[in-house]
């Protein structure tokens, strides 16, 4: 959120795993489609963010001027309902200042975050309490950009070796 590291693009949260929905916002090559399908079946909804090449109609401000976008399906019924009401796709950012710990509850949110948003919904304590794992599928070799709630070993069991 505040003081965001521009290396990471914004994340688009999706209502459900559908290749067509992902392809509305990102390019998915044939090879990446197979990997994405395996990852989605294993880890979505859940704490896995997949980086793909964004389509041109996604405004550059949403991706910090870059050409990639993060895609994720959250594992929270309330979030899924909000995404559904927003048309099935919702641009989001994290609820922490870049580099700081991920809050597990409303009470752990920093005052800097609370002062910058118009609405906060307290949905209880986060079951994971850890950031999502981020995997980049924009090149021939999948690459882990951030270790998170899903272990690299779990990902490698599904799609093989990652960088």
Region annotations inferred by a language model:
Residues 1-163:
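Active-site-adjacent structural elements in enzyme catalytic cores
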């Amino acid at each position: 959120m505040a003081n965001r590291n521009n290396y990471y693009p914004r994340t688009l949260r999706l209502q459900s795993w559908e290749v067509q929905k992902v392809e509305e916002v990102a390019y998915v090559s044939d090879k990446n489609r197979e990997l994405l399908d395996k990852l989605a079946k294993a880890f979505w909804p859940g704490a896995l963010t997949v980086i793909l090449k964004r389509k041109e109609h996604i405004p550059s401000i949403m991706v910090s001027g870059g050409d990639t976008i993060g895609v994720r399906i959250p594992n929270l019924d309330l979030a899924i309902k909000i995404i559904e009401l927003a048309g099935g796709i919702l641009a989001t950012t994290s609820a922490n200042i870049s580099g700081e710990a991920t809050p597990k509850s409303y009470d752990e949110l920093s005052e800097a975050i609370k002062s910058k948003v118009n609405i906060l919904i307290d949905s209880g304590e986060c079951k994971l309490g850890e950031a999502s794992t981020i995997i980049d599928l924009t090149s021939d070799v999948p690459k882990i950009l951030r270790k998170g709630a899903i272990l690299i070993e779990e990902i490698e069991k599904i799609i093989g070796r990652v960088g």
